[in-house]
């Protein structure tokens, strides 16, 4: 039986792969794929405008290849975790 943290990490990985590769490289998220992931998997996603998602994509895309790789996605999750932690204080 997997521990809750194992399950949570597995879910984060599975969500990345659920959206990556719908178009182009199956190991990265395009802008369209990232937008869909954010809008469907995060409560705040429905509230974000296209310009905000584009700005987020630009911030996440450290190597400027117009895609978000898994490492960049993990950095995004880390930033989200910090925000959630602050909200709980």
Swiss-Prot record:
Q: Which InterPro entries does this UniProt record tie to the protein?
A: EF-hand-dom_pair, EF_Hand_1_Ca_BS, EF_hand_dom, S-100A6, S100/CaBP7/8-like_CS, S100_Ca-bd_sub
Write the record's keywords in alphabetical order, separated by commas. Acetylation, Calcium, Cell membrane, Cytoplasm, Membrane, Metal-binding, Nucleus, Repeat
Residues bound to Ca(2+) 1 are 28, 33
N6-succinyllysine carried by residues: 47
Annotated transmembrane regions: none
The record's section on PROSITE patterns has:
EF_HAND_1 (PS00018), EF_HAND_2 (PS50222), S100_CABP (PS00303)
Modified positions (N6-acetyllysine) are 40, 47
Domain of life, per UniProt, equals Eukaryota
| Primary location | nucleus
Q: Where in the cell is it found?
A: Nucleus envelope; Cytoplasm; Cell membrane
Summarize the subunit comment.
Homodimer; head to tail assembly of 2 subunits. Interacts with CACYBP in a calcium-dependent manner. Interacts with ANXA2 and ANXA11 (via N-terminus). Interacts with SUGT1. Interacts with TP53; has higher affinity for TP53 that is phosphorylated on its N-terminal domain, and lower affinity for TP53 that is phosphorylated on its C-terminal domain. Interacts with tropomyosin. Interacts with FKBP4. Interacts with PPP5C (via TPR repeats); the interaction is calcium-dependent and modulates PPP5C activity. Interacts with TPPP; this interaction inhibits TPPP dimerization.
Query: In its UniProt entry, what is this protein called?
Result: Protein S100-A6
Species, as recorded: Rattus norvegicus (Rat)
Query: Which lineage is the organism of this entry classified under, starting from the top rank?
Result: Eukaryota, Metazoa, Chordata, Craniata, Vertebrata
Query: Which gene is annotated as encoding this protein in its UniProt record?
Result: S100a6
């Amino acid at each position: 039986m997997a521990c809750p943290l194992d399950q949570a990490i597995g879910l984060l990985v599975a969500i990345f792969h659920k959206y990556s590769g719908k178009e182009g490289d199956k190991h990265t998220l395009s802008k369209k794929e990232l937008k869909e992931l954010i809008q469907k998997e995060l409560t705040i996603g429905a509230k974000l405008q296209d310009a905000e998602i584009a700005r987020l994509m630009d911030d996440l895309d450290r190597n400027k290849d117009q895609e978000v790789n898994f490492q960049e996605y993990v950095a995004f999750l880390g930033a989200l975790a910090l925000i959630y932690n602050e909200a709980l204080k």
